[in-house]
Amino acid sequence: MTKRTLQGSKRKKIRVSGFRARMKTPCGRSILNSRRRKGRKKIMVS
């Protein structure tokens, strides 16, 4: 049987798309602001 393609890692996910990672770049901050404007319950993944 073939190996499953998605083998998620919590650490990798947070490093890529966590709150601190989003705050680092201007684009990431705009993502957070747009999610706040939309009224999302969760602003980021973690």
UniProtKB/Swiss-Prot annotation:
Chief place of localization: plastid
Pfam families in UniProt: Ribosomal_L34
InterPro entries attached to this UniProt entry: Ribosomal_bL34 (IPR000271), Ribosomal_bL34_CS (IPR020939)
GO molecular function, one term: structural constituent of ribosome
GO biological process annotation, one example: translation
Gene Ontology cellular-component annotations: chloroplast; ribonucleoprotein complex; ribosome
Keyword annotations: Chloroplast, Plastid, Ribonucleoprotein, Ribosomal protein
Places the protein is found: Plastid, Chloroplast
Highest taxon above the source species: Eukaryota
Record family assignment: Belongs to the bacterial ribosomal protein bL34 family.
UniProt protein name: Large ribosomal subunit protein bL34c
Organism: Pyropia yezoensis (Susabi-nori)
Gene behind the chain: rpl34
